[in-house]
Amino acid sequence: MQPPGGDAPAGCPFSGARAAQPAQAPHEAPHVPGEADAQAGWHNAQLDFSKSMSYGDYLSLNSILDAQHPLSPDHNEMLFIIQHQTSELWMKLALFELRGALDAVRTDALPPAFKMLARVSRILEQLVQAWNVLSTMTPSEYSAMRPYLGQSSGFQSYQYRQLEFLLGNKNAQMLQPHAHRPDILEQVRATLEAPSFYDEVVRLLARRGFPIAAERLERDWTQPTRHDETVEAAWLEVYRHPQQHWELYEMAEELVDLEDAFRQWRFRHVTTVERIIGFKQGTGGTSGAPYLRKMLDVVLFPELWHVRTTL
């Protein structure tokens, strides 16, 4: 969406808009491309990038588009690779936005945090839709390339693991798949040991005057989020009097939106796996679909869901 009065530049590759064309007078002959266009540039567009940055330069497209290296002769492996690479790019943005929102919450700058959280929810919706593309792969097609995957698995995604940790689903055992990469292990461990986004929101509740239990405000951050009665009591007050606590009310709903989108992503993951490989063991050694179904029961922000029953 463009800001009011700020039309996208003609032909901008990011806007998807086509350059506006002046209407031809009835007596004018149709334009025929020729030498004059080659000299002036097509509709005044810059065509020579020998001394300036191009679209491909800015986006490092050579590196991105040369990063697909299928190991099998099977045609469908390219789909499998690009599906996961693009998912990793979206997760990179989700982590970037979540960390920005976390910093904003720490300084009580909630409106910017709302914007970032809404963006994370939209990113998760994009990831949900991506499963529709991968699900065009049939069991026969996947079986042809699966032997070439070895033990590699999405279970080992260090960005996904950081996303889980940042949202409060902590598990120190999940550090082990990254032990062979000390640089990555350090990143994942730092996220495990730091307060989650929801932990910072609970601290926000305390700063706004709600009586949150001291043991909830300072705890072992490597442990997953557990239901706390004092936190639910705070959210109950927020939901009963939203006009008095509007920012906290909006924060609560942004978090519910986010977890709702995350649950949908998990569900589509399960159904896509069941559709393609059934109930075979995953390449990373997990039970596959049964493991993923168990993950559907994980609740990231328990008080925000339970308070709906209490209201």
From Swiss-Prot:
Cofactor note: Binds 1 heme group per subunit.
GO biological process: L-tryptophan catabolic process to acetyl-CoA; L-tryptophan catabolic process to kynurenine
Annotated positions binding heme: H269
Reaction catalysed by this enzyme: L-tryptophan + O2 = N-formyl-L-kynurenine
Biased composition (Low complexity): 17-33
SUPFAM superfamilies: Indolic compounds 2,3-dioxygenase-like (SSF140959)
EC number(s) on file: 1.13.11.11
Enzyme class: oxidoreductase
Cofactor annotation: heme
Pathway assignment: Amino-acid degradation; L-tryptophan degradation via kynurenine pathway; L-kynurenine from L-tryptophan: step 1/2
InterPro entries: Trp/Indoleamine_2_3_dOase-like (IPR037217), Trp_2-3-dOase_bac (IPR017485), Trp_2_3_dOase (IPR004981)
Protein function: Heme-dependent dioxygenase that catalyzes the oxidative cleavage of the L-tryptophan (L-Trp) pyrrole ring and converts L-tryptophan to N-formyl-L-kynurenine. Catalyzes the oxidative cleavage of the indole moiety.
Subunit structure: Homotetramer.
Protein name: Tryptophan 2,3-dioxygenase
Organism of provenance: Burkholderia cenocepacia (strain HI2424)
